[in-house]
Amino acid sequence: ALDPVKGPSRVEVVFFEPEKFTDVKDAYMGSDKGRDATLELLKDYLTTRGVRGLLPGQKLAITLTDVDLAGDFEPWRGGQWGDVRIVKDIYPPRISLAFRLTDAAGAVVNEGKRDLRDMAFMMKLTMGFRDDPLRHEKALLDDWLSAEFRSAKKP
């Protein structure tokens, strides 16, 4: 939705074929509704955080092409454990995306494709997200945003 105070968003996030994403399930069997809710949370997060690295007039378009949430379901544990996401270092968060950064005139400043993965995600402190089920994915996106767009703020 358009915020009348801020105007149109400077960060656009879209998902390419989300039904084919590796793992965005909220339960072992998952549902379209659960997947869409999870992706909407990631979209909101990227829309909010992505603006921080932009210079005035710049716009950022991000297309997520795959998401594999940290952890996995281990149904062989049996019973009620079938729908519990088990987070271990062997199941790192992974996100594949394409992006395009444009200036106020619409000229492309930077663009590319990135395959993000954090094999050390279990070793990091994610204090701001401690109770957030997407804390590892959000930390991965924060790392990418700060590394990719840190130079955009420098004169």
Model-derived features with residue positions:
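Surface-exposed short loop/turn segments
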Residues: 64-102
